[in-house]
Amino acid sequence: MLVKTFGAAVQGINATIVTIEVNVSQGIRFLHVGLPDNAVKESHERIASALEFCGFKLPRKQIVINMAPADIRKEGSAYDLSLAIGILAGGETLQFEELDKYVIMGELSLDGGLQPIKGVLPIAIKAREEGFKGFILPKQNAREAAVVNNLDVYGVENIKEVIDFFNGDSTLEPTIVNTRDEFFSNINLSDIDFSDVKGQENVKRALEVAAAGGHNIIMVGPPGAGKSMLAKRIPSILPPLSLQEALETTKIHSVAGNIDNNTSLISQRPFRSPHHTISDVALVGGGAFPQPGEISLAHNGVLFLDELPEFKRTVLEVMRQPLEDRKICISRAKFSIEYPASFMLVASMNPCPCGYYNHPDRDCVCGPGIVQKYLSRISGPLLDRIDIHIEIIPVPFEKMAEMRESELSELVRNRVIKARNIQEQRFKDIDGVYCNAQMTSKQQRTFAPTDKASSELLKNAMQRLNLSARAYDRIIKVARTIADLDDSENIQSNHIAEAINYRNLDREGWAG
């Protein structure tokens, strides 16, 4: 008897419905076709054990399973439940009239229990698009899938619940999540604030500019100056995620398997801080069976690279293209996968190996040329892609007690949101551009023209600092953001001057 069940394969952050055809007929063979990987092929033993534990047996007949479309590779053990239900229906142990209305996914334990799977949100979205009535999956994943409206999501703990459901012996209660309530209830939850950091007003201003325009930034300063503390507070001044951004971010983390049982939607901007020993693949994504890397997990949020020169040169260089394209394409012999990677890069570094070059109170012990050699670990092309360079001078301990209360993140965020709203209006007719950092050179000429005084000031800076053409573009973009924060329609010379001031690492003699 031939029956069909439905599962899904996840490629990138999107899913494709997989039709699982099960034919139970006379014979003794078990055949599995349709480009399954080893984990799928090994499902036979898991299914047999799970069914036996729950009081059922595999049909003592020939079982042929085809998974279509055949050109898409089916990976992992997430098809176990769908395969098992198809086999039981083919052996006439289970009623199959309703099977075509549901997508069924789940990894089986040997005792019939279900283990959580990855990529649930993209699968649920695809199931709704294809007109399925419901989605049956492990209970641990139910809240994540229930974010999708107009789709009945049934979380189950074991295969017997599914069998009884299709045989009409019991009912399943759908998991219900109010997506908007879930989103808005968690959107502003944060236990850290900009006001936690005493002093460093010039650095906070640079971070405000970076947040307002979506600019990449690098902070250079000695140990203990507050680089990491400031970086961790950047999400608190960024605009809240929109619902669309939250769904896109959650899809990426769903594919990576980072959504826990109690989470349905990621409502806050991601903050990723990988260790400097990270590999190329872990940073940008990939592998034999591609997974999103840190740059994609930081999509719509912040990627913080602490001690930037300590990262391997190859790791930093593979990041150059995603910084420009805001996506990463992973190509293999038979397929390619694209992951979004639109993030704000925040980097920090010591000015030299000992960390005390230019320190007001400590002497640097690094010899001549060592400082420049240390800085040269960061290539020019990568540094050009970082819009803002800011030097941090540590605040003396005795002055901290005298300082007034610092500004709250909420106040800074309000200014950032106002500037972002200006940019949203500016780029409303341009696809893929939402903030000043994303402008192309052509768009700069339209949206960020400079007057004669500003052009002359910038020309002198270009000659004196020997800046590249890319650095020129970065200065214009940053100046446009500063003008937006000032609610100025045109870029003034003071905006250009401040933007030039944020190119510390371009200055001749900065490192000796």
Description of each model-found segment:
Residues M219-D260, D325:
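Walker A/P-loop
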Residues A39-H44, P59, N66-G76, F289-P290, ...:
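Basic, amphipathic alpha-helical bundle interface domains used for macromolecular binding and assembly
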Residues N300, D306-E307, V318:
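Walker B catalytic acidic pair
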Residues M1-I218, P222-S228, S331, A471-Y472, ...:
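Peripheral, non-AAA+ core regions of ATP-driven protein-machinery
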Residues L110, L303-F304, E310-F311:
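Residues immediately C-terminal
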Residues V18-V24, L283, D387-I390:
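Short beta-strand elements
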Residues S170-V209, G213, P240-I295:
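P-loop NTPase nucleotide-binding/switch module
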